[in-house]
């Protein structure tokens, strides 16, 4: 899980979602997981 100020999809399987007010990227590749904050 990477925590960074700007989250962007890295590959075509990355999905940008909102959970509890936080913007997150979920992907089948665990290296692509990101959270904003």
UniProtKB/Swiss-Prot annotation:
The name under which this protein is listed is Large ribosomal subunit protein bL36
Decide whether keyword Transit peptide is in the record.
Answer: no
Q: Which domain of life is it from?
A: Bacteria
Which PANTHER family does the UniProt record give? 50S RIBOSOMAL PROTEIN L36, CHLOROPLASTIC, LARGE RIBOSOMAL SUBUNIT PROTEIN BL36C
The record's Gene Ontology cellular component field reads: cytoplasm; ribonucleoprotein complex; ribosome
What family is it from?
A: Belongs to the bacterial ribosomal protein bL36 family.
Any one GO BP annotation for this protein: translation
Entry-linked NCBIfam families: rpmJ_bact
UniProt key word Lipid metabolism: no
Q: Which InterPro entries match?
A: Ribosomal_bL36, Ribosomal_bL36_sp
Coiled-coil spans are none
Key words, A-Z: Ribonucleoprotein, Ribosomal protein
Q: Which GO terms describe its molecular function?
A: structural constituent of ribosome
Please name the source species. Staphylococcus saprophyticus subsp. saprophyticus (strain ATCC 15305 / DSM 20229 / NCIMB 8711 / NCTC 7292 / S-41)
> Taxonomic lineage per UniProt?
Bacteria, Bacillati, Bacillota, Bacilli, Bacillales
């Amino acid at each position: 899980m990477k925590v960074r100020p700007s989250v962007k999809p890295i590959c075509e399987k990355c999905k940008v979602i909102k959970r509890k007010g936080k913007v997150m990227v979920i992907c089948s590749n665990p290296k692509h997981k990101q959270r904003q904050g």
